[in-house]
Amino acid sequence: MSVCIYRGGYQMVRKSGVGKALEHQAAALKSAGLPLIDQIPPAGPEAKECVVHLNTVLPSAPLAAARAHARGCKVVYYGHSTMEDFRNSFFGSNLLAPLFKRWLIFCYRQGDVVITPSVYSRRILMGYKIGKPIYTLSNGIDTGFFHPDPARGARFRDRYGLAEGQKCVISVGHWMVRKGLPDFVELARRMPEVRFIWFGQTDEALLTDEIRKAMEAAPGNVLFAGYVGAEDLCDAYCGADAFAFLSHEETEGIVVLEALACGIPTIVRDIPVYANWLEDGKSVYKAANVNQFEAKLRDMLNGHLPSLKEGGMAVAEARSLGQIGQALCRIYASGGFLDAAMTAPAADTHTARKRA
């Protein structure tokens, strides 16, 4: 058996969570001992033993699914996107959202099975009536790369000119209302003694008026650092004093796993996607609005709240790429793609199978 992770359109999603998920799949499958191939094989015995992973909903992806099926391959379609997390993303996204949902349904129906990263996103996709088995499986986290490292932290603080004792709060994501950027700016305005740094960016042509106004009016203690690579981002997780993820809608949030793996105190918005796996006061702190974010951040930065480092790192470790690779094997076996005798002994599979 072999696996082809289809990379059509990869350059368009490389800097997004979908791009990270694609790389995580490759590493997870390698850890499970499954061979990866670069191209969908031609019709024949090799194709019949090949599983093709699709991660985007770009036009080339359903075409690749059709080509894979015609050659005898099985197709796993990853449900990273929903209409719900498409809204409030860029200029015109709310108007296009209903059409985007119809396109998602068409794409996901091209898979023999669908994998989505959370119980919450699975519930949404079940409501789309896709008609294919839908499994829940985290995108995973490379805990060998993302882990606490004081030297990395010192490098981050030196790079951004943070004096000893200077508090710093970071966030990561595209410049979107959905990602909570306006609230991040408001927090900075309320906490002028704290440095706020936002990593990530969006093409300026796609920005909404609300985002433009928020960024233009941002106080001097806010830095929009733009997109940075994994090395620099890991440095930031290791050196900042808190990670605030204010997103209003997610299917999982890989950056949350990265932060937890690095042991940084983390606060997230109290939204449904986290209900089944992030517990307030045990692995993260949660807040429902800007006032709560401000109050809890102040307490976190001043040492008035207990450290949740161990609980957060345990959440990340349970979703290490080694665990994800074994869970993928079990999904293949359930889907009839792989002899069950070849799969590893079952741990927590993070999977569920029902027809949408």
Predicted regions and their residues:
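Short alpha-helical donor nucleotide-sugar binding micro-motif in glycosyltransferases
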Residues: 108, 227-228, 235-240
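Conserved acidic donor-binding segment of nucleotide-sugar-dependent glycosyltransferases
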Residues: 280-291, 298-305
